[in-house]
């Protein structure tokens, strides 16, 4: 469980521990933008989550490796195999943000966001997939592995001021589809979630939407823990028949996203002349549904 020291990752790790999972709680303990954290408790966020899981009767160990460093990712996988002698699921959740309007975006900011989100998903999943492939070949049976990736509404629809984040999260959807197609032969599933919840990433950008309810007993739709039962189910044997899917979840609403679908199509059976393109595009758009709006636009 990567990025498990706070927010969604913390909630997922605790939920998994509650259901008997042996959890590797990975977190670097950094600030929201990826800079060094300022923890003063003497314990890292990962260690605090481990303590919470074990206090509730679960089993967990902390790991502080960088998900986007290939050898660091290898140590994350090795931690599970050394401590628990098995690897059943990988939940990729670690991320950072460097919000900036596209025209002002810096090269280093872009690289940092893409590195942690997209490369981080690649590194950990790639090494897990290698383990499961070898296990399936050795035993002659499906490995039963589970990959749960974390995309976002920004990756599905785009989000103003978050070009790098949106691009990374869209890339994660593409990665998930390929993982599902390629790893099915080894009995491994891959799915992605696009959650909306109150975290360090969202409560500053979408403060009003993420606010906790004002009345006691009112359903807190944006509580991170609302997302975690979906993650736990996707990690379980019950989800064996579900792969290559993206699930949007916020509060009590769960949606299967339909992905890119062909809308209007025109095939004239020959090369288009340039004068025909504009007329055809106008006609196709006219009979295609309007796209959902980008986050941050009216």
Model-derived features with residue positions:
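C-terminal helical subdomain
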Residues: 192, 213-298
